[in-house]
């Protein structure tokens, strides 16, 4: 990911994040400071879909709320900022350190874990981000797999 593909969020993109975070807090009762609580809600929705108790169409909403809430939590907790990565001719939501040395993809992570029907991943993702930000030693391409996973896992 080349740094020149990053840009600040537009007002509409910022509103999208805010609306998804507010939905999670107000409508679902999710604690925005607790990745385990976010993960529990994600896991419950995934289980309902797998068991046929919820329509598959809820995936986009669940992934949107999960990505927005996790990214919001990490921005507040670690001083990260939202941006848009326009690499590969598509826009991807990212959170990055002020120095832009550490870039993470919370929406991509939520989508990946939804597709793979994986739960119990948000606390680990949050811990990985915390460690990388503390060290500012994130890999050059955080989407690339590493021995400990990627910034999408």
Where are the predicted features?
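A sequence-level detector of short, solvent-exposed, charge-rich linear segments
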Residues: 32-40, 61, 65, 89-93, ...
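Generic structural signal for hydrophobic core residues of well-folded globular domains
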Residues: 49, 53, 77-78, 113-114, ...
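A recognition module on extended beta-rich or small alphabeta surfaces enriched in W/G with H and D/E
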Residues: 94-153
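Amphipathic protein-protein interaction modules
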Residues: 60-113
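N-terminal low-complexity, intrinsically disordered segments
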Residues: 1-60
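Compositionally biased, low-complexity repeat tracts
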Residues: 25, 53, 63-67, 75, ...
């Amino acid at each position: 990911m080349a740094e020149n593909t990053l840009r600040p969020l537009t007002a509409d993109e910022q509103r999208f994040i805010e609306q998804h975070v507010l939905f999670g807090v107000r409508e679902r009762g999710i604690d925005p400071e607790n990745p385990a609580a976010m993960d529990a809600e994600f896991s419950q929705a995934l289980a309902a879909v797998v068991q046929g108790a919820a329509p598959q169409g809820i995936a986009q909403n669940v992934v949107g709320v999960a990505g927005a809430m996790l990214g919001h939590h990490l921005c507040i907790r670690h001083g990260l900022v939202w941006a848009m990565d326009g690499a590969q001719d598509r826009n991807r939501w990212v959170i990055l350190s002020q120095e832009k040395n550490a870039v993470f993809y919370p929406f991509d992570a939520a989508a990946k874990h939804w597709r793979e029907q994986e739960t119990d991943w948000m606390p680990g993702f949050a811990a990985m981000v915390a460690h990388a930000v503390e060290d500012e030693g994130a890999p050059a391409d955080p989407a690339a797999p590493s021995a400990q996973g990627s910034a999408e896992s």
